[in-house]
């Protein structure tokens, strides 16, 4: 369940809509879209989309639209597409990282191998764009294709930065923006675009563009906070909460903000070669050293600042929409508290 979903549902329900019904429709349509693609490939695609998750991105599509009642087919298509893209990136990430667990379950690459996992991710990407294209408008496809291009660049940046002790704070956030925040931005832009189509006479074109940009900025800011908090959670664990071993980022050479800042505070960490870590126990011991520096508290403060910045970027919106989006932003932090 997405952060703050219960409170968000109550706010939106007061405006005459049922968030849970919309999200059920998203789930059902995703399941239909990945069915019928062969026994093996279809099985892994279905398992991927049914594995759960926060469904935060489709929720943002719905809330950014400002359409409280009777969401359009265009809006549902956008919500489905953005979540399928997210699922596809997770499958491909696991291939590149060699991850064996996600959400406490074996990954596709662990259970079926690299070729099958790559094909599963490709299928999810294809179904996402087919779903958008079937709506007949070019703008949603443009928004999502731009985001997928950025996702690919972010993944390559992460590979380039692997094991690199000199990754800067700026480069870390550039990578987070590409790998994570752009899809949050796309979710909000897709929602805004669908909402404007639903209300074609609602304001001048310039105002509609500013609204889309402001909502996109909101999404990008909470996406950055989301990724930073996720990186903190990799250090703090525990595995039963994260669904993966504590310190998994350290073991695959991914340098995140907690480690970058801890190296500034502890000279012994500055000389640590991540390639020397071989076991989960060794990674957990380094996590304890990172936590002892106070770097996690600093990182949390930065994430909280990003959430406050996100809320400050929201334009003047209907009360239900403003409240619901602010609750989602707060929920990103609350999930990690």
Describe the residue ranges of each PLM region:
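Mg2+-dependent prenyl diphosphate-binding active-site environment of isoprenoid biosynthetic enzymes
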Residues: 31-268, 330
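Short acidic alpha-helix initiation/capping motifs at coil-to-helix transition points
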Residues: 20-22, 120-122, 250-251, 301-306
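Mobile late-domain/C-terminal helix-loop "cap" segments
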Residues: 266, 270-314
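Short, structured helix-loop boundary elements
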Residues: 16, 20, 75, 141, ...
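Short, charged, low-complexity loops and linkers
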Residues: 5-13, 106-108, 164-170, 285-293
């Amino acid at each position: 369940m997405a952060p703050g979903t219960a409170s968000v549902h109550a706010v939106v329900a007061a405006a005459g809509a049922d968030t849970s019904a919309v999200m059920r429709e998203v789930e059902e349509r995703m399941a239909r879209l990945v069915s019928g693609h062969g026994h093996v490939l279809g099985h892994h695609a279905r398992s991927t989309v049914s594995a759960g998750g926060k469904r935060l991105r489709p929720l943002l599509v719905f809330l950014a639209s400002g359409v409280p009642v009777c969401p359009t087919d265009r809006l549902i298509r956008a919500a489905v597409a953005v979540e399928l893209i997210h699922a596809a990136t997770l499958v491909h990430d696991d291939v590149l990282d060699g991850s064996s667990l996600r959400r406490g379950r074996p990954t596709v690459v662990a259970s079926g191998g690299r070729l099958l996992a790559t094909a599963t991710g490709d299928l999810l990407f294809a179904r996402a764009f087919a779903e958008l294209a079937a709506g007949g408008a070019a703008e949603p496809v443009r928004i999502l294709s731009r985001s997928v291009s950025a996702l690919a660049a972010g993944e390559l940046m992460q590979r380039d930065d692997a094991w690199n002790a000199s990754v800067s704070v700026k480069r870390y956030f550039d990578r987070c923006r590409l790998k994570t925040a752009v899809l949050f931005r796309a979710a909000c832009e897709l929602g805004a675009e669908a909402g404007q189509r639903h209300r074609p006479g609602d304001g001048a074109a310039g105002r509609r563009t500013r609204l889309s940009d402001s909502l996109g900025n909101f999404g990008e800011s909470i996406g950055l906070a989301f990724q930073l908090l996720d990186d903190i959670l990799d250090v703090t664990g525990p595995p039963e909460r994260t669904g993966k071993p504590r310190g998994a980022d350290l073991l695959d050479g991914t340098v995140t903000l907690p480690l970058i800042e801890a190296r500034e505070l502890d000279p012994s960490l500055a000389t640590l070669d991540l390639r020397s870590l071989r076991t989960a126990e060794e990674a957990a011991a380094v996590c304890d050293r990172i936590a002892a520096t106070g770097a996690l508290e600093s990182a949390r403060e930065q994430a909280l600042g990003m959430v406050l910045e996100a809320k400050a970027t929201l334009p003047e919106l209907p009360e239900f929409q403003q409240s619901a989006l602010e609750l989602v932003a707060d929920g990103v932090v609350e999930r990690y508290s």
